């Protein structure tokens, strides 16, 4: 394969990834909601926190949105990560309060608990209590591979486990 053609394909692939990365924002015309994880009734900060056997998952409106919409989730994926990959299989969570003691025998400082909620599992609740599905990002054509990042498919939080 000629070098120029290979370079063109790489540029096209990079552009496709960049274009789809903003799909969750562009689809709804508003910033996406935010996943928050609470341990001992306190929000886990971005730099991380020590492990806690119970955690609460919340989906909060983006601070840039002031229209009174709140959010719920039907299903979240929780994965214990080490380095760049999963250390344990992903666990599906269907309620806000989750028991994390199953991670005890595997976890160590420096690992991450990765929480992902797909757009298809988000519910927007308006100020008057009406529920509606969160807008779905545009799907790739059936014959094309899905190269979208997690950020284009939903919302996530990464909890760095400290000592």
Locate the predicted segments by residue:
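Bacterial Sec-dependent N-terminal signal peptides
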Residues: 1-31
């Amino acid at each position: 394969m000629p070098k120029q053609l290979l370079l063109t394909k790489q540029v096209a692939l990079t552009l496709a990834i960049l274009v789809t990365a903003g799909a969750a924002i562009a689809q709804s015309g508003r910033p996406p909601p935010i996943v928050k994880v609470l341990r001992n009734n306190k929000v886990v900060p971005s730099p991380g926190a020590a492990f806690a056997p119970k955690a609460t998952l919340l989906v909060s409106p983006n601070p840039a949105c002031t229209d009174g919409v709140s959010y719920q989730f039907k299903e979240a994926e929780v994965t214990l990560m080490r380095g760049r990959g999963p250390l344990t299989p992903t666990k599906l969570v269907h309620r806000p309060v989750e028991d994390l003691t199953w991670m005890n025998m595997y976890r160590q400082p420096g690992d991450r608990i990765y929480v992902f909620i797909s757009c298809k599992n988000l519910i927007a609740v308006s100020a008057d209590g009406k529920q509606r599905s969160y807008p779905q990002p545009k799907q790739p054509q059936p014959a094309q591979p899905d190269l979208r990042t997690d950020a284009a498919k939903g919302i996530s939080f990464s909890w760095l486990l400290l000592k």
